[in-house]
Amino acid sequence: VNEEVRRFLAEIEGDMGGLPRDLHITRMFSSLVAISNGRVIKVADPKLEYCPLASSLYDFPRGLDAESLRKEIIKAAERKISELGLFTGLRPLHRSTIAIPFGASEMMMYDLKSGRAEAAVVVCDGAGTVIAEDPHLVQGIGARMNGVFYTSPIEAVIRGIEEGGGEVLSPETARIDQVAGVERALGRHGRIDVTVSGFCGEGLREIRELESERGASVTILAVCTTGASEERVREIGEFADLVWSCASGKVRGVLGRRARLQIATKIPVYALTDRGLDFAASYSSKGFREYISEFEGPYIISGRCGAIPGARDCRRIRMGDFETYIARVESLPIRSGDEPRPLL
């Protein structure tokens, strides 16, 4: 956990005279949210004023003060608990449909289906680090899930993952340790995907060292980057294959400029490497590979190709289960007027 999460845990401990046995920390609308026994027990002050994704999913009103935003965050978290069972033993663990068009779990699901990757190392509330080969288990864990920065064991979740063919790194503690998860996965697989928190300090360099030692191929997806420090963003740029920009101005400004591919404009995903392009290609059943072999990049994927300044050679392609467009541009990033505010 990073210092901000550590302080949040200390506040919970002080408020309650100790940490609850059942405790999960996620983040919504830039605020850390603590959940215990199926209810929200603490919400940090929000730093964002607006997020297009949150507004779309939860109908957040605009122009709210901090206290009103906190109440909306609590309502949104409670909906996730009551409607989806997240942070409880009732959460679903298998899903085959797309929840977020360019979500990390959606793209990993297709990557596993294509055979490009053999397994994925992900994080699940109630289980911690999980190694999974089943595409639908990966999507079931990740669909509609924000970042998980701390969690505790939930027996029903761990049992469901194991019965579904997944492996929980530490069933006794639900420890989140993506480096150890990669090491475990590389004992059986040579090609894996792994999600790594951009906000916390999970060891990107250590993952690359393991990859080199084992002669493996590891696709690193840097997610949950809101609030990432400049040093962390540079580290992501050095070691990750793809990065989700979330509400990070540093990711857009530093890594967007060197991206090979930008996916979407409001909350862009940037492919930084050839391996990142291959990963994106596995999400496309039609048109993507042909396009990048025909034209030099950088590229942008957007549903509104005609509105992208300087876009050339627009072509319709299929990504996931929907149609969109790819084009080439002179430079990236392409910014949107409808992005999170303020960028952090």
Residue map of PLM features:
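Conserved mixed alpha/beta catalytic, RNA-binding, or beta-rich assembly cores of soluble enzyme
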Residues: N2-L344
